């Protein structure tokens, strides 16, 4: 079915900042709608999110230029194209843009159209989006990586690491995993209350208390897991997003940026040793961006030390880009890739990155951004690609719940075909 009309508009995301929403209307009248997320901590090689820069509107964060590009440049170019030719449509937009970082049209403009086209095609065929993208072999429900303590650039808490996540690996179904996560989240709230700490939440719905560093945050999570009636390692493991690029400068990992005078300053070797110690002292089985995006030697060291027993996820390192992923594979850096659709800026390129990762034995983690909307597309992408893992925030804020609730619906629809789990990485636990 051919594209008849494309409409872009400016809406607000979960932080109250403008973002792009797109409607793609087919000749049949069927419509697909998508909105675009936005990150707070971003990799320097990410596709360019086009902002207006007009300080008199939204502090310069308006997206009217991107919307105008959709309505005046992209829409005429795609009108009449077959909505089911996803690769052809995405290529047409990339050719129209003509820049390596999508700086002419804006990655937010291109992505909004790309996702809305896929939704329109799925709606026209009257099939779920995950089935349209993934075909008949879609059955794996993702393990949720729930960010229950926020630090770094996602909160005002004096902790360098950006996310402390729980992973309900012992669940039998996604529904059970969601319940386990919610119970730990509420138990953590009580742990923090008893210490007189704030239970206000950060950008992704996790708590942002004034804890005394990384170990204090981890100990609070352990206490919450046990208070909820679960056993660390067996039922629930912990994942970290260090977001190390945020506090890396001139070869030094400078924790004082977020933690003040009490923070450490570590070399790459010391950073690796610190992460290794944490992985032995706590039930940690996934570490994201443990090293900075440009510290490739540090990444090699970390992968050599921990890669055979811990998932090492490249986010800023790979930015969902096959060029950087290919380099990581050839140089032995990381063993997993974080998938963020807005890092690369089109559905086709996102799927290409997932395919390359899976073909080379890397796990994939489908991810949200800290600035989100009610759009739940990433839930469908996680199932469509059998990703096995999803990062979409904590157990509060409706922008995060939209994804979890969509996954509940998908699991219900799949019925007994659904399998909960992910490609496991062997881990030697501390005796």
Swiss-Prot record:
Enzyme's top EC category:
lyase
- Catalytic activity from the UniProt record: (2R)-2-phosphoglycerate = phosphoenolpyruvate + H2O
Catalytic site: 204, 340
Q: What biological process terms from GO does the record include? A: glycolytic process
Annotated (2R)-2-phosphoglycerate binding sites? 162, 340, 369-370, 391
SMART domains according to UniProt: Enolase_C, Enolase_N
What the entry lists under PROSITE patterns is as follows: ENOLASE
The terms under GO molecular function for this entry are:
magnesium ion binding; phosphopyruvate hydratase activity
Q: What is the annotated localization of this protein?
A: Cytoplasm; Secreted; Cell surface
Q: Which GO terms describe its cellular component?
A: cell surface; extracellular region; phosphopyruvate hydratase complex
EC number from the UniProt entry: 4.2.1.11
Q: Which UniProt keywords apply?
A: Cytoplasm, Glycolysis, Lyase, Magnesium, Metal-binding, Secreted
Question: InterPro entries given for it?
Answer: Enolase (IPR000941), Enolase-like_C_sf (IPR036849), Enolase-like_N (IPR029017), Enolase_C (IPR020810), Enolase_CS (IPR020809), Enolase_N (IPR020811)
Give the co-factor note: Binds a second Mg(2+) ion via substrate during catalysis.
Of which family is this protein a member? Belongs to the enolase family.
- What is this protein's name? Enolase
Q: Which organism is it from?
A: Phocaeicola vulgatus (strain ATCC 8482 / DSM 1447 / JCM 5826 / CCUG 4940 / NBRC 14291 / NCTC 11154) (Bacteroides vulgatus)
